[in-house]
Curated annotation (Swiss-Prot):
Coiled coil: none
Protein name from the UniProt record: tRNA uridine 5-carboxymethylaminomethyl modification enzyme MnmG
The UniProt record lists the keyword Glycoprotein: no
Positions of FAD binding: G11, G12, G13, H14, A15, G16
Keywords: Cytoplasm, FAD, Flavoprotein, NAD, tRNA processing
Assembly, per entry: Homodimer. Heterotetramer of two MnmE and two MnmG subunits.
High-level lineage: Bacteria, Pseudomonadati, Pseudomonadota, Alphaproteobacteria, Hyphomicrobiales
Any one GO MF annotation of this record: flavin adenine dinucleotide binding
Xref: Pfam families: GIDA, GIDA_C_1st, SAM_GIDA_C
Domain of life: Bacteria
Matching InterPro entries: FAD/NAD-bd_sf, GIDA_C_N, MnmG, MnmG-rel, MnmG-rel_CS, MnmG_C, MnmG_C_subdom, MnmG_C_subdom_sf
Function of the molecule: NAD-binding protein involved in the addition of a carboxymethylaminomethyl (cmnm) group at the wobble position (U34) of certain tRNAs, forming tRNA-cmnm(5)s(2)U34.
One GO CC term, this protein: cytosol
Length: 626
């Protein structure tokens, strides 16, 4: 085994796998350090990928030739497009996954990645010199040199599990925590915080009364995450839906003092949008019930994940809770739910590349940055892995901004605003969500991936073919036109203004779809259904996209005004509050400054004017020197 790598990635979860694979795709010699190869790709909490906002991230990871989309397609056992009744911008692909199939597919993908080696062991310390990371030391004493290191430790940094009145050190159930790395961070001056997350009990599906619960099928046919997946071939299953009852709530209220969150045992903050069942009852006491999704964990595994009742109440209380829920009265508990606390780094310690400001060559991704969720972790891992290679090799950084994708929105939120609770992606966080749709992730990002060199030959060829077909189909739809009188003969009611309208124009009407225009122009039948969907969505959003393009151009103008070397004490007109905030956060651009709390439009105007004055001075200085 070699003892030196271009990039070392610590942690084999969702962030670590994407980071390691991305680095290796760029040709870097890469090592993935994990406790055991068998735990690579493990789904620590819910057996599902995607969802609202999260599904966008999976599609964006796929567009950059990442792994998660293809692995989810291989392991998915129920696919649903959430928000299907709403517009395409807020629809979210989601898949229920077979835990074993998902992990096996991820492990196979890691094995097949050229330039990537796996080292089994516990990373115990970071090695550095002259303000730059130089490698790592394992708990067994082995040392490995690296040009860059990516840390993706999930909940393992000083992880502490809580179950009722009991607590014990662990990274997740039955796995040891990572203690040495926390000490390394503290020695380097990083301020560590504590966050909390939780998981529900696991149930024996053979003891559930499935006849007493509502059943929810998936989409037919299922829609894959990856553009490279022609069709889903794994057998599909149904999930169940039940609800808590007033009796459930009474059990929880009677025992809430035994919950670590309410006994004072846990002081850290949990995810607002994924609260424990005891938190739901305390915060929403007027509700008569809370929905629970019964999600099978595998095709040949009877274990069921009851999504919606995350808890750290004592095991006997969890059993009592289950007896009050329709369909679960006689269910057997496979494993109790629990809460886990872990260390995280303030993400404002990071550059938009996810490199730390304190130590060059050190990158962080996933829950260590204060996020929650597999998809958020995967997207960060991919960005960190790409930039680790570029930093180690002296290349230009790969920065994704808020107009590029949800991954850019997330990273900008983290490094600009920081977090005070685990960060979860939602479509509402994106200003340009009409542009940043799940259906066009490859159209937005694959060309950028090709320029970076992280997209392989198969995807590159597929992308070129698809984009050519899309351009041809759109041109065809724009070339075919009809008058209002002609349209009326086909059953379409248009404004009788004498204006000819193209097939593309007609598709912008809410009530007109591809089938209607194809009935008028049979030549449109030659367009594949997959391409037709894109043309129709583009037509529906055409007017709005033109407006949003102007907004994006204004955003990018502000992002182009760099603030990196400004002495804010020399900027006249800034309030002391604004000056202090700008000095503390050191935003890279005027646009980023505007996203800081407490920075007013007036302060931004002062900064922009100052930059213009300084820009006018520089040419005069050069001329004088000559």
């Amino acid at each position: 085994m070699r003892n030196s790598y271009d990039v070392i990635v610590i942690g084999g979860g969702h962030a670590g796998c994407e980071a390691a694979a991305a680095a290796a795709r760029l040709g870097a010699t890469t090592a993935l350090v994990t406790h055991r190869f068998a735990t690579i790709g493990a789904m620590s909490c819910n057996p599902a990928i995607g969802g609202l906002g999260k599904g966008h991230l999976v599609r964006e990871v796929d567009a950059l030739d990442g792994l998660m989309g293809r692995v989810a397609d291989a392991g998915g056992i129920q696919f649903r497009m959430l928000n299907r009744r709403k517009g395409p911008a807020v629809r979210g692909p989601r898949a229920q996954a077979d835990r074993k199939l998902y992990a096996a597919a991820m492990q196979a993908a890691i094995r097949a990645t050229v330039h990537l080696s796996v080292i089994e062991g516990e990373a115990d310390a970071l090695l550095s010199a002259d303000g730059r990371v130089t490698g790592i030391r394992l708990a067994d004493g082995r040392e490995f040199a690296a040009g860059a290191v990516v840390i993706t430790t999930g909940t393992f940094l000083r992880g502490l599990i809580h179950l009722g009145e009991q607590s014990w050190p662990a990274g997740r159930i039955d796995e040891a925590p990572a203690l040495g790395l926390s000490r390394s961070f503290e020695a380097l001056g990083f301020a560590l915080g504590r966050l909390k997350t939780g998981t529900p009990p696991r149930l024996d599906g053979r003891t559930i009364d499935w006849g007493a619960v509502e059943m929810q099928p998936g989409d037919d046919p299922p829609e894959p995450f990856s553009v490279l997946t022609p069709a889903i071939t794994t057998p599909q299953i149904e999930c169940g839906i039940t609800r808590t009852t007033p009796a459930t709530h009474a059990v929880i209220r009677d025992n809430v003092h035994r919950s670590p969150m309410y006994s004072g045992q846990i002081q850290s903050t949990g995810p607002r949008y994924c609260p424990s069942i005891e938190d739901k009852i305390v915060r929403f006491g007027d509700r008569d019930g809370h929905q629970i999704f019964l999600e099978p964990e595998g095709l040949d595994d009877p274990t069921v994940y009851p999504n919606g009742i995350s808890t750290s109440l004592p095991e006997e209380v969890q059993r009592a809770i289950l007896k009050t829920i329709p369909g679960l009265e006689r269910t057997e508990l496979v494993r109790p739910g629990y809460a886990i606390e872990y260390d995280h780094v303030d993400p404002r310690e990071l550059e938009p590349t996810l490199q730390t400001k304190r130590l060059r060559g050190l990158f962080l991704a996933g829950q260590i940055n204060g996020t929650t969720g597999y998809e958020e972790a995967a997207a960060q891992g991919l960005v960190a892995g790409l930039n680790a290679v570029l930093a180690a090799g002296g290349g230009d950084p790969a920065v994704f901004d808020r107009a590029d994708g949800y991954l850019g929105v997330m990273i900008d939120d983290l490094v600009t605003r920081g977090i005070n609770e685990p960060y979860r992606m939602f479509t509402s966080r994106a200003e340009y969500r009409l542009t940043l749709r799940a259906d066009n992730a490859d159209q937005r990002l694959t060309d950028k991936g090709l320029a970076l060199g992280c997209v392989g030959a198969e995807r590159a060829a597929f992308h070129r073919t698809k984009m050519a077909a899309l351009a041809d189909a759109k041109a065809l739809a724009q070339s075919l036109s009809i008058t209002p009188n002609e349209a009326s003969r086909h059953g379409l009611s248009l404004n009788r203004d004498g204006q000819r309208r193209s097939a593309f124009d007609l598709l912008s009407y809410p009530e007109i779809g591809w089938d209607e225009v194809k009935a008028i122009w049979p030549e449109l039948a030659a367009v594949s259904p997959a391409i037709a969907v894109h043309v129709e969505i583009d037509a529906k959003y055409h007017v709005y996209l033109a407006r949003q393009t102007a907004d994006v151009e204004a955003f990018r103008r502000d992002e182009g005004l760099l603030l990196t070397e400004i002495d804010y004490a020399q900027v006249p007109g800034l309030s002391n509050e604004a000056r202090n905030r700008l000095e503390r956060h050191r935003p890279r651009t005027v646009g980023q400054a505007g996203r800081l709390d407490g920075i007013t439009p007036a302060a931004l105007g002062i900064l922009a004017a100052y930059l213009r004055r300084e820009a006018r001075k520089r040419p005069a200085t050069v001329s004088g020197e000559r």
